[in-house]
């Protein structure tokens, strides 16, 4: 990795016509990258349609492409870099509790108990696993994943509608910009038996699995800086207040969709005798505009 400056490096392309890889991180971080991670980054850069690749400081070897890398591909979809934990993301909820409230042991215990009563955790766990879990169910789950946070879905889940305004993907549409495409796709998967154990998987929405999923209550501290205060106001954060940070994904529901896409595209590559980028079967892709790409976009 060549040095660009104190916080950035450059992994030169192995040959002409292939983009190099931007590496974000101090010199110590850049020295710590696994050789397999760097090889995967260069392999991804040489794949069809890829125009840019960036390695973040936490990048490590993944499914054909490094986990923690960012790639731009305007014409091709790559399931490998996306991964299999769909909607794996962070959310932050500002509570109306002041920070000093948690100094009281009883309040701490009540907060922990309230969270545990409502939040299923662990492999295979779903909404029926906790006493006060939100009953997702088959019909409501279908609407949630094909419509997003509509007024009807919010009412059914007991979620304030105004929360939808702060959600980055409050509404869902398919490859053609319609909800109907999503409904047709999910109906097709169910009717053809390509979504086994759907009922149990849909009930896992709104829960934590194993791995690195977590929920964490913290005290918000806004530093004495105008930009920091503006940012806090934008996100509705209260200095000295308690906020709940959550990291989770779509559990078994999203995992099935993602792994099924891997298998479908790998079968398509084998049937059509298409060359794998770098010989790596995890780097199968779908050119935009093809039925394979449309199905992937609808699934995800």
Positions of predicted regions on the chain:
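Active-site cofactor/substrate anionic-group-binding motifs, chiefly glycine-
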Residues: 59-87
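Short, flexible loop/turn elements at secondary-structure junctions
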Residues: 58-60, 218-221, 248-250
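Short glycine-rich or small-residue beta-strand-to-loop segments that form or flank ligand, phosphate
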Residues: 54-56, 243-247
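Glycine-rich, flexible loop motifs
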Residues: 1-52, 76, 80-81, 86-232, ...
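Short acidic, Gly/Ser-rich segments with clustered Asp/Glu that frequently serve as metal-coordination loops
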Residues: 61-62, 89, 249-254
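Conserved ATP phosphate-binding architecture of protein kinases
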Residues: 71, 234-235
């Amino acid at each position: 990795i060549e040095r660009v400056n104190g916080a950035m490096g450059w992994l030169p392309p192995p040959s002409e016509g292939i983009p190099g890889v931007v590496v974000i991180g101090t010199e110590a971080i850049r020295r710590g990258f696994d050789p397999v991670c760097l090889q995967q980054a260069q392999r991804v850069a040489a794949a069809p349609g890829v125009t840019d690749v960036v390695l973040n400081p936490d990048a490590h070897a993944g499914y054909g492409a490094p986990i923690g890398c960012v790639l731009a591909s305007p014409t091709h979809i790559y399931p490998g870099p996306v991964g299999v934990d769909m909607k794996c993301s962070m959310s932050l909820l500002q509570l109306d509790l002041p920070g000093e409230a948690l100094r009281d042991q009883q309040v701490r215990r009540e907060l922990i108990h309230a969270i545990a009563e409502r939040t299923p955790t662990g492999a295979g766990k779903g909404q029926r696993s906790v006493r006060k879990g939100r009953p997702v169910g088959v019909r409501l789950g279908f609407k949630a994943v094909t419509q997003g946070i509509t007024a009807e879905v919010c009412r059914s889940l007991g979620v304030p509608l105004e929360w939808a305004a702060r959600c980055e993907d409050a509404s869902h549409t398919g490859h053609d910009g319609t909800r109907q495409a999503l409904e047709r796709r999910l109906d097709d998967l169910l009717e053809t038996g390509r979504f086994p154990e759907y009922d149990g998987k849909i009930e896992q929405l709104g829960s934590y699995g194993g791995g690195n999923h977590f929920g964490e209550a913290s005290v918000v501290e806004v530093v004495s800086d105008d930009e920091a205060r503006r940012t806090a106001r934008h996100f509705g954060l209260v200095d000295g207040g308690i906020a709940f940070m959550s990291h989770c994904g779509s559990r078994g529901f999203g995992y099935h969709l993602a792994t099924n896409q891997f298998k479908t595209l790998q079968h398509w590559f084998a049937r059509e005798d298409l060359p794998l980028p770098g010989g790596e079967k995890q780097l199968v892709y779908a050119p935009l505009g093809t039925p394979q790409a449309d199905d992937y976009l609808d699934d995800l």
